[in-house]
Amino acid sequence: MKRVIAGAFAVWLVGWAGGFGTAIAASEPAYPWAPGPPPSPSPVGDASTAKVVYALGGARMPGIPWYEYTNQAGSQYFPNAKHDLIDYPAGAAFSWWPTMLLPPGSHQDNMTVGVAVKDGTNSLDNAIHHGTDPAAAVGLSQGSLVLDQEQARLANDPTAPAPDKLQFTTFGDPTGRHAFGASFLARIFPPGSHIPIPFIEYTMPQQVDSQYDTNHVVTAYDGFSDFPDRPDNLLAVANAAIGAAIAHTPIGFTGPGDVPPQNIRTTVNSRGATTTTYLVPVNHLPLTLPLRYLGMSDAEVDQIDSVLQPQIDAAYARNDNWFTRPVSVDPVRGLDPLTAPGSIVEGARGLLGSPAFGG
């Protein structure tokens, strides 16, 4: 029965894609050539000089091991550093969650995301000013908002640490921009604008030239942090929506070795600090993942992907240049969103296995 459903879905999906006709330009496979040597990124991995990581986790969904995720995030980028978890009201994004469904012993952060981020920024700022070791601030998803605010604050702080004592790394920043694109919210709300959603109430930070080296780690097709440049491409929007659901949080548990060279871009700002983007490929298109789950063979779904991916990739401006386009799908080394730590499957098991759901 699952294969019947999968077959029907595949026929509909390919037919839907074909209905776009020539309105979606086809993109070509990536060409392994990059013009000229780019600036060198700040050292990560075993070369990292950070001795401590100030870790800020994402939105604390009821039932997930938030502290465990937060302590693991960025560990492959800074493997030799001890983790100092910066606690803040990370559950604000779920302040609307029905209390009857909260796991026993949990609490609810009844405030807006904007207030929670301000709280986290103050805590991070305090840790940075009292720290003595070279440090890296790491933000996973919502935690990246805290890093954005703190960088803007430190940019004009005469008591800020020296540039060689601190760096920032965001994983899946839902309000940020990066060398290969931008987040969903950044495409809607410019710097300084207010997000008027009741439980969010967050003001986008002004863009500043930070004195600190910065890394942005993003999953390809993650609709939160890597939204299409051309949202009229509905196929790409649908793919990004599924990508946001399954490939957003796992980005925090990847390492620099998961990123091919053409997916790393570094720029130098007016203050001499580097900003490096690491675009992590996925192992398959998120849009067709249900087909694999429903029983279609990888070979069959790969054929469908070969039809859909050029149309989806045409929605991203980074693919316009045939010589410099990055790799978005790597079946061998790409991120597997269903088996990585922080996956939606793992999160669902944690939630449904809680006593609130009879687990």
From Swiss-Prot:
Pfam families, per the entry: PE-PPE (PF08237)
Main location: membrane
Activity regulation as described: Activity is probably potentiated by the DAT/PAT transporter MmpL10. Inhibited by the lipase inhibitor tetrahydrolipstatin (THL).
GO cellular component: peptidoglycan-based cell wall; plasma membrane
Location(s) in or outside the cell: Cell inner membrane
Sequence ranges assigned to domain PE-PPE in this UniProt record: 79-316
Keywords on record: Acyltransferase, Cell inner membrane, Cell membrane, Lipid biosynthesis, Lipid metabolism, Membrane, Transferase, Transmembrane, Transmembrane helix
Record flagged with keyword Metal-binding: no
InterPro entries: PE-PPE_C (IPR013228)
Null mutant phenotype: Mutant accumulates DAT in the cytoplasm and at the cell surface. Does not produce PAT.
Family assignment from sequence similarity: Belongs to the mycobacterial PPE family.
Protein name as annotated: Diacyltrehalose acyltransferase Chp2
The species this protein was found in: Mycobacterium tuberculosis (strain ATCC 25618 / H37Rv)
Phylogenetic placement of the source organism: Bacteria, Bacillati, Actinomycetota, Actinomycetes, Mycobacteriales
Gene: chp2
